[in-house]
Each structure stands twice: as C-alpha cells, then as structure tokens.
C-alpha cells in the first residue's frame, strides 16, 4: 500500500466512524480541537496525519487507535 492509499483509507475510516456517531465535520473538529478544514483534509487524504492527531481523533470518536487505522 502506498502512502497516498493509506491516507485515503484512514480518511474513509474517519468518515465512517464520524457518520456512525451522527457527527458533522464541525462536531468532530470541536471534539478533537481542530478546525473543520483540517478534518476535511484528513478525510479526503490530503494531509499526512501525525500519530497524535490520530490519537485525538480516535479519543473523540470513542474508538481505539487500532480500530481507527484498521
């Protein structure tokens, strides 16, 4: 798997988990202290998230880091 494929896969997983909670991008952004545009870029695979960003997102979504990136 390439780096770009991995970023897109993680982005799709974030979308899936976020929508399961009934959250908008703004809701997730508030919960993990990011702005909506940052969440949008993550979900679209436009940026390479840091481990800490992934941790914050998993914590906000109430899932393990492992589940977020599986």
Please identify what each model-predicted range represents.
Residues 1-9:
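A detector for short, charged/polar N-terminal pre-domain segments
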Residues 33-47:
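Recognition helix of helix-turn-helix/homeodomain-like DNA-binding domains
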Residues 44, 63, 70:
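Short, conserved catalytic or interaction motifs in soluble domains
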Residues 14, 28-29, 39-42, 68:
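Conserved hydrophobic/aromatic packing and binding residues within compact polymer-binding modules
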Residues 12-31, 56:
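Short basic helix-loop element that most often maps to the first helix and adjoining turn
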Residues 8, 19-20, 48:
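Short amphipathic helical patch at the helix-1/turn junction of helix-turn-helix
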Residues 50-67:
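DNA major-groove recognition helix of helix-turn-helix/homeodomain DNA-binding modules
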């Amino acid at each position: 798997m390439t780096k770009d494929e991995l970023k897109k896969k993680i982005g799709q997983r974030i979308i899936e988990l976020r929508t399961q909670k009934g959250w908008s991008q703004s809701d997730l952004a508030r919960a993990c202290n990011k702005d909506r545009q940052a969440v949008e870029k993550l979900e679209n695979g436009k940026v390479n998230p840091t481990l800490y960003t992934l941790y914050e997102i998993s914590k906000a979504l109430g899932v393990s880091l492992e589940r977020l990136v599986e």
